[in-house]
């Protein structure tokens, strides 16, 4: 299934519907470093681009942040919480040249990291504990997908693997039962989110669910909308109505609900 999905997605980014003129679909190009007046301020190549914009505004770059500021930024960015007084004092008294790197490694190894940054992906995946519409019934296993996302971040799972598991985790080979279960839980990406479960037309309910799944997949993995092509060739993004139903046919092979009737239950 995943191979067919990828093949179909390749058709979406084609030379039709103005794709050649849209900046988002243009090939990535190497850029020369801009010339700056105070190059000694830079440490990385990206700094040249930042500094160039600063100098365009006749401004001056800020001074390097203090260690106290750095540790607060690191904790708030990676854990979402400020450091304790003891943690601040320990970092300030650490004179080792790699103290900053050690701090970052420590924060990344904490389960708080996955809880903090997994939330961003859960927003992309439209996560909720209920379906969020009409009857607003509870999704009894949604929490398993939430924990899967948090665990994936904490394990530093490769992003390509993260994508595959959420689209076709049940079809992947597994070394043991634990891995099989983890991969299958990744499919929660397709089952969570708003779904009209009180629809009295089973066929329409199923097709509406597929439309919602495809729209979310397009936004999450392609940075583009797909839903408009359900009724007509997309007016902006490079996807035709033919492409839409070619991809929808693949999703028709999946089973999201135990039964497609009022009120439906999750599979």
Tell me the role of every PLM-derived stretch.
Residues 3-15:
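Bacterial N-terminal signal peptides
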Residues 19-267:
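Short, structured secondary-structure elements
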């Amino acid at each position: 299934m995943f191979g067919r999905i990828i093949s179909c997605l390749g058709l979406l980014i084609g030379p039709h519907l103005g794709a050649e003129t849209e900046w988002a679909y243009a090939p990535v190009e190497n850029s020369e470093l801009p010339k700056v007046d105070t190059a000694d301020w830079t440490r990385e190549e990206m700094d040249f681009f930042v500094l160039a914009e600063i100098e365009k505004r006749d401004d001056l770059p800020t001074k390097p942040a203090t260690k106290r500021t750095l540790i607060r930024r690191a904790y708030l960015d990676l854990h979402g919480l400020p450091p304790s007084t003891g943690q601040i004092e320990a970092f300030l008294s650490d004179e080792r040249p790699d103290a900053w790197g050690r701090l970052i490694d420590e924060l990344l190894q904490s389960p708080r990291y996955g809880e903090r940054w997994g939330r961003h992906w859960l927003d992309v995946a439209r996560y909720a504990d209920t379906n969020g519409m009409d009857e607003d019934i509870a999704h009894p296993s949604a929490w398993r997908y939430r924990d899967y996302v948090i665990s994936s971040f904490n394990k530093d799972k490769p992003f390509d693997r993260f994508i595959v598991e959420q689209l076709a985790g049940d079809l992947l080979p597994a070394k043991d039962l634990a891995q099989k279960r983890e991969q299958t839980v990744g499919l929660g990406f397709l089952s969570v989110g708003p779904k009209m479960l009180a629809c009295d037309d089973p066929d329409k309910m199923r097709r509406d669910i597929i439309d919602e799944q495809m729209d979310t997949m397009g936004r999450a993995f392609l940075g583009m909308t797909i839903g408009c092509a359900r009724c007509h060739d997309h007016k902006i993004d490079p996807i035709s109505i033919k492409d839409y139903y070619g991809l929808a046919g693949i999703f028709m092979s999946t089973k999201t609900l135990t039964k497609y009737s009022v009120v439906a239950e999750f599979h």
